[in-house]
Amino acid sequence: MRSLEKLLAILAALLGFFGVMLAAASAHLAPGTSLGSAALILLTQAPAVLAVLAAVRTGLFGRSFGFLGALALVIGSVLFAGGITMRLLTSLSLPAMLAPIGGTLLIAGWLLLFLSGIFALRRR
């Protein structure tokens, strides 16, 4: 699990990196577009993933559901922000489906984290 923890931390850093890039692009290159929403998701989920890793380490969240929830947040964020960004930059129809799938994964990730916290409470 140690390598998964490191991978999730690295991916969270990438979410933050791309979130700042998209925020800058939204402000300077494409104001008034949904790039701001993509940036917001990335910039809020990046520290959330890091917080989840800390919560798993301290026992506030269970390991299995905690890591699974964090992974869902990472994948959901990439799909959501990637779908919005690709839709704005290309004429492909596939990206239109990525954002709703990513949003659904984000919702599922937060539900998994809720359950992880509940299960951790019951074990004490």
Residues of each region from the PLM?
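Polytopic transmembrane helical bundles with strong interfacial aromatic enrichment
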Residues: 1-124
